[in-house]
Swiss-Prot record:
GO terms for cellular component: extracellular region. Transmembrane segments: none annotated. The lineage of its organism: Eukaryota, Metazoa, Chordata, Craniata, Vertebrata. It is found in: Secreted. This is [Ser6, Val10, Asp11]-phyllokinin. Expressed by the skin glands. It comes from Agalychnis spurrelli.
Amino acid sequence: MSFLKKSLLLVLFLGLVSFSICEEEKRETEEEENEDDMDEESEEKKRESPDRPPGFSPFRVD
């Protein structure tokens, strides 16, 4: 009976370890995707606003 308990505990432990490794890899890929999206957004903003100070409006209001 103790052999079955040890085997069961070993299987559960190994399953838990593999599950946590998969979750960690999933988080890393999501973080990389988010960083790529942020880089793309910042590049778009750079293209939209050429060397103008913040708050500058090209329209003149009299």
